[in-house]
Curated annotation (Swiss-Prot):
S-Lysyl-methionine sulfilimine (Lys-Met) (interchain with M-1623) crosslink residues: K1741
Source organism per UniProt: Caenorhabditis elegans
Name of this protein: Collagen alpha-1(IV) chain
Xref: Pfam families: C4, Collagen
Stated consequence of mutating G409E: In allele g23/hc70; temperature-sensitive lethality during late embryogenesis
Single Gene Ontology MF annotation: extracellular matrix structural constituent conferring tensile strength
Amino acid sequence: MSRLSLLGLTAAVVLLSSFCQDRIHVDAAAACKGCAPPCVCPGTKGERGNPGFGGEPGHPGAPGQDGPEGAPGAPGMFGAEGDFGDMGSKGARGDRGLPGSPGHPGLQGLDGLPGLKGEEGIPGCNGTDGFPGMPGLAGPPGQSGQNGNPGRPGLSGPPGEGGVNSQGRKGVKGESGRSGVPGLPGNSGYPGLKGAKGDPGPYGLPGFPGVSGLKGRMGVRTSGVKGEKGLPGPPGPPGQPGSYPWASKPIEMEVLQGPVGPAGVKGEKGRDGPVGPPGMLGLDGPPGYPGLKGQKGDLGDAGQRGKRGKDGVPGNYGEKGSQGEQGLGGTPGYPGTKGGAGEPGYPGRPGFEGDCGPEGPLGEGTGEAGPHGAQGFDGVQGGKGLPGHDGLPGPVGPRGPVGAPGAPGQPGIDGMPGYTEKGDRGEDGYPGFAGEPGLPGEPGDCGYPGEDGLPGYDIQGPPGLDGQSGRDGFPGIPGDIGDPGYSGEKGFPGTGVNKVGPPGMTGLPGEPGMPGRIGVDGYPGPPGNNGERGEDCGYCPDGVPGNAGDPGFPGMNGYPGPPGPNGDHGDCGMPGAPGKPGSAGSDGLSGSPGLPGIPGYPGMKGEAGEIVGPMENPAGIPGLKGDHGLPGLPGRPGSDGLPGYPGGPGQNGFPGLQGEPGLAGIDGKRGRQGSLGIPGLQGPPGDSFPGQPGTPGYKGERGADGLPGLPGAQGPRGIPAPLRIVNQVAGQPGVDGMPGLPGDRGADGLPGLPGPVGPDGYPGTPGERGMDGLPGFPGLHGEPGMRGQQGEVGFNGIDGDCGEPGLDGYPGAPGAPGAPGETGFGFPGQVGYPGPNGDAGAAGLPGPDGYPGRDGLPGTPGYPGEAGMNGQDGAPGQPGSRGESGLVGIDGKKGRDGTPGTRGQDGGPGYSGEAGAPGQNGMDGYPGAPGDQGYPGSPGQDGYPGPSGIPGEDGLVGFPGLRGEHGDNGLPGLEGECGEEGSRGLDGVPGYPGEHGTDGLPGLPGADGQPGFVGEAGEPGTPGYRGQPGEPGNLAYPGQPGDVGYPGPDGPPGLPGQDGLPGLNGERGDNGDSYPGNPGLSGQPGDAGYDGLDGVPGPPGYPGITGMPGLKGESGLPGLPGRQGNDGIPGQPGLEGECGEDGFPGSPGQPGYPGQQGREGEKGYPGIPGENGLPGLRGQDGQPGLKGENGLDGQPGYPGSAGQLGTPGDVGYPGAPGENGDNGNQGRDGQPGLRGESGQPGQPGLPGRDGQPGPVGPPGDDGYPGAPGQDIYGPPGQAGQDGYPGLDGLPGAPGLNGEPGSPGQYGMPGLPGGPGESGLPGYPGERGLPGLDGKRGHDGLPGAPGVPGVEGVPGLEGDCGEDGYPGAPGAPGSNGYPGERGLPGVPGQQGRSGDNGYPGAPGQPGIKGPRGDDGFPGRDGLDGLPGRPGREGLPGPMAMAVRNPPGQPGENGYPGEKGYPGLPGDNGLSGPPGKAGYPGAPGTDGYPGPPGLSGMPGHGGDQGFQGAAGRTGNPGLPGTPGYPGSPGGWAPSRGFTFAKHSQTTAVPQCPPGASQLWEGYSLLYVQGNGRASGQDLGQPGSCLSKFNTMPFMFCNMNSVCHVSSRNDYSFWLSTDEPMTPMMNPVTGTAIRPYISRCAVCEVPTQIIAVHSQDTSVPQCPQGWSGMWTGYSFVMHTAAGAEGTGQSLQSPGSCLEEFRAVPFIECHGRGTCNYYATNHGFWLSIVDQDKQFRKPMSQTLKAGGLKDRVSRCQVCLKNR
């Protein structure tokens, strides 16, 4: 060991000497000037010594502070696939969510188009003035208003009388008076007579925005700002299956179409595997079977015009053609000459209803009560009503059972065992405020189960005798108007009479219109006359200074000032608030068991106990407080205590050896901002080099859509398109247009979600140098850095103290040998103060090196020397070891936003943090702005109660006292302990009800009692006043963010912040380790509390004996309605009813009065918690209450917002004939017909009788085109004589509309048939151009009430009230029922016009008004279908035919717009002949002229458009009967497909004669994104060949599709399989028994469903045969009140089996179940004699449901 030490010492000497050799003299002198002689050690460098042995390890250091949270580790490897977990138990019902935040106000709608000018209305008659309204109640004195505008000067009044103290003289003209308070709104006047016809007004301003349109398509899903917590929804469907170990979030799969694999055996649904790699392209398959014959192709393009064919034999006269379509409108003709006076016109249409006249006189008379209306549908749930006034206290209920023992308190600190003498009883202190609730105590030992109680007796008395009949009540108020009934069947057309009826009664006043736009300010009125002279004023002293004004609104924030100079270093601040508790340390070592306690003294003998048992003794007087007992005997040794707290940090150990440089650590999270450090010295300005610009980051995710911009102005009307209509086939979508001009900048949108974190950009330009921060903790020693550049020689620093010799350094490079110096010696003297700088002496000769002297004592540091000259560059040294970390700089200014980074991976769920320490109470806030004038306040609270007197002895039960006045509120009593159950006292006589007392002070929170019995319903409380609506706040736009200022000093503690929005639910953390604690020692019983205040009076006595009923008096005259009486005496309690169903949770009740202090009971053992009882039976319905008297008339309400569009009204009477419509467009060219063979001209036969119309023949196939004819120009032939017109054939019956069939195969060309008889009218032509917009129709009925509006913007904050006593924490109440409507409040002063609020809830639908006048005729609608042929007309007159040469058809001009008709002008002078005008409109047919000469045939013109139908020709001679045609065969079957559903798990069989196409599962409808899309159960689309709970996916605009990752639904026809016993959802293969099977069948003819609306199966129509019978299924709804329906003509509306809900609901997570929101709708039976009567409501129970369901049959048309 000594050798080793010597070796180490030698190495140290060698190293030290070598170290000293490398130092230059100048450095040595500079480093330790004044410490010791310079170290001069000549000699050669020794060899490197062996490394020394490591020293002993130092003491372990104190535990450091908690380090910053480490960065998340790299994601681990995927774990092995876990097994399916067991199905979890049903979760507890979630808490009621917070109400959602109000949505953003919608944008203002576009202005409507200006309406057309209305026709002049009939002038109304003047109405009579209404009666003056009743004088209103006197309002409270209002606040002084602002000075009004100067009024008009009044007329000069007579001179006033002289004042008291003056002879009086004319005063100066007084200032204008202030504007008076606006009067109350008067009652609406009666409607006035219609005024005279007014001049046509100018075009009106654009109308108000129209009614909101239907909901548009769903917009892009953007993440909006998180709303407030919503109300709890209905119980949700079961949760999703557990996540796999590696599934940190749902994987959004992009759907790629993979190759179809071979069909395997259908197994259970597997788990979703990861997407596999794309497969290889498969080989070409074998050629398929030849496909079915394709559908008939579209018509080809028209071929070239063929040559003219030979003239055929004249055919038979055709049938009279139908009227052709109207031609295009001609160009306007020249104005005609003024016509003569016309004949009197028909009576004009009634004009629009005139404005309402003034109110007529009140009519008298009492109508009889109308019939009771049908029960209306449930209204939309209203918003939460204002809280009503507290009701009168109900009768005291029976005493509840003893409550459960309260939670044990927190154990106190163990005190030293003391011994005190009992002192005198102190005076009662004031009751203290309620303290903060203590932390929950440790659980006590389990008690023993108590003994069973005595069984109770259920006694039910006999029912009472029937009372005598009451007097007849007053006639009831007419009931509400019932909902509009269903539309009846269309009645028979009435017979109109061409008369104008007498004018109708003046209609009721209409609903107030929408508020008009704010008008333009009017011109100032003329100055008024001088006012009357004011009275002289006597001695007018100065006014008393007014009260201090309300504090003003806080001003706007000023602009940030320039940064101020650096402040001085502040004083040390007050110690900060205690920090949040640190994270839990690791478990400490188990503490040693405690020492046994000191043995207690034996206790005194207790007093005799109370007799326990069913004795009827009254409770005794409580005894005096006993003395403290002596300490008890020592208890048993306690069990091991809880683990001790971790020990404090130990003292710092000695520093250990420097370790190896560690690996580079993971970047820690950004630390908290450090406090401001001491400002450092001003550093030199750093160099700045501009960095290279960074590469642009990745594009962030799409932000939230901004609010839509304001609508742009309406563009000018476009040029009308040319009216050349080629085949009306929709063209291909056009090319996208050029981007529009940029709109104005919209308001800032809501902030988008943060984009993914982008990659690090290139370094930016260095910012300005920040201030130095506080010194940071020393960092770890880093690895040696790269060799730095050679720095300039700095100034000499202040001489420091000589340090201890450092560790041995590495040997340096050998320095240049110095000149030998003189040998010096001497004893080191004490260090003197440094002297002044002497003059520079001449340089001495260098002396030889001296021996090294011993180190001198460290001297005191000298003053800093002056700056020396720059030395020469030294030789580069070895790279030094890495220095310690520098001080942390002060945070620089906020840098510019970096490019958004890519989104990081979701972190794992964090550990649950411990509850934080409760925050300190915030300071009182500044007083808010003064509120508006409120309604008169309710009476203030009474003062504090006086001290309670000494309780007197119980007196005898007195007679009922007179009605007491308001009692004072008592102070809250201390919480007494539970006393024993007292005996039931005698019932007192019920007292008169007292007036409504004011609310008492809140009491201390009582212990939770056992739930009491359901008390009888109390009488309704008086309705509360309605609060004034607050003014909405202005919508402010966010300002630009200011520059980050310097950090300011810590401000005073801020006001307590409002509760933040609830955070998102965190993911469930892992189960923590739990160690059961050992039970603590039993504490000593506490002292008895102070006596409580007097309790409330005892329960009411038994009800008195009912008196004998009086004789029935005669009915008196009905009196005037009295004012609302006081609340009556509570009635006698009825017989105890059976338990009712659970009601909704009531609102939290007022705290009860404190009870009398009971005697201290013995501490019982805690009982075992009982099991949940069974729900009670439903109680009997109570008797309906008496109808209340009518309330006072309320003030007129604010105009309601426009309701939604109502349902379409009843079919109106047929309108007057409309004006002739514009001419329609020309029809398209027809296809050329087949060429017939030449027939022989027949002899004219006798006219035959009209034959019956024959059956419609099948359409012939297209023939081949004929050979082109040659053009032959022959001489014109002689004009033949005109033949007689033929008779018209009878019209054929209209054919039924057939369903479109599949295209048939091409047939062979048929034989040319003989001329067939007239066919039925053809199919309607293609749809024409859309007609002009019709005129505005009548307003529809008011719509159903809309969805409740969003909550309004909160009003301004009122003045702060005085601090109240701390209330007891109430239980969270559920939403109460809306209170009854309160009495009308006193009319308030007219407030300022508020900003437009959010749209309120739609009002109730108004009473249906009388039928309005006929509106203007609408614009021409679309051309209707051709009507049935009219009756045969008489043969027309014989016309002379004239053949004019056909002219060239002109091009169609653009139809001009219809101008207003001008007034006829006077005849002007004849002008010179003008140019040839445009061809005029065709005039009326002139008399036939003489036959002209036959002209040369003209060239064949192009085929013209189809001309208008010609006039009816003369009847021709009857032709010869043609040969009978051969009977046609059956047309080929087009095939009709339908689906048939079995409603079982068996695949249904197609009916006889039908062939099955495929089989599958019965899909009813799907619901995605909250919208339902249904299937017709009679169509093949409702039979999917494969089943899945989520058979569809949704795709977005980013070409990404998602499968089973949303809350969507699918609904399937179900079987009769019942629900599971636990009613939990089914999953996997357990779903199969619930899903109905189906088959798709094909039949050759049409198939329909007929419904009887009766319990009997209907018969198929003649020519149809039945296929199956069933029940008429109409509609279905489910989640979100969404659903679809069945067409009643479809076979899907006739289900073979009836079930109330014939379908099951399935979700995307693979579960199916029946839910309470699923409803089925079935046609009900309608009796023949009750078709137009009010339907009787009826509720059917199970077993009799089919008695009211309509039956149906599916029928097939016979061939």
